[in-house]
Amino acid sequence: MPETKKIAVIAGDGIGPEVVAEAIKVLKRTEELFGYRFEFEHGLFGGIAIDEKGTPLPEDTLRMCQAADAVLLGAVGGPKWDNNPKELRPETGLLGIRKALGLYANLRPAVVFDCLIEASTLKPEVLRGTDLIVVRELTGGIYFGEKYRRDAENGQIAVDTCVYSVPEIERIVRRAFEIARQRRKKLASVDKANVLETSRLWRETVNRIAPEYPDVELEHVLVDNAAMQLLRRPASFDVIVTENMFG
């Protein structure tokens, strides 16, 4: 008898409940076809949690997620809460759960199927063969740095601090190299090393780790160029690793 896996379900806001309901149908079908066993527990999160419990990430929801084997999250936020103070914004709960669960690696695959290739505004010959994955660092950088405002002579000044440590960079870069090793063995590290000190540290760390993976081809791409190349030649990318804001 297979072990029952606990899944914490937090549908969230907007289209979230609709999407999550369909995902649960798929999971239940896998139970029937492959013999898996899932136990679903539901919790409030995001805007709906603010409305009902006064916080975007209730303690009982966080405990439920910490006790689960996996978390199934729908969508967070909406215009209704856009003008809330920072601590009462749905996105604050999202950052909180990422930090609390140590969710440092965000894996974003992008595959273009031939049957859908005409649905894009890009030419089919540009898109054909696209199969890439973006590995985004998720718990560091500008999203988690110190934020504040202060009064100045000509009005307020707002500050968002971008901070990265070597261990934070190392763990996401190694994860990306491992993923590339299992795929087509190509890794593009995206940064802004011509301007940002955090990006220079990022690039130095990537270069130091690269010899551990001699079978993986590495290239460095500045983020603005990466955006252009994803439109011009998306099929040339295999694995992309980058920091929180760029991902």
Residue ranges and their predicted role:
Residues 8-25, 30-31, 154-224:
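Glycine-rich phosphate/diphosphate-binding loop of Rossmann-like nucleotide-binding domains
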Residues 33-59, 228-230:
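N-terminal beta-loop-helix "entrance" segment that forms/cooperates
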Residues 51-159, 245:
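N-terminal glycine-rich phosphate/adenylate-binding segment common to multiple enzyme folds
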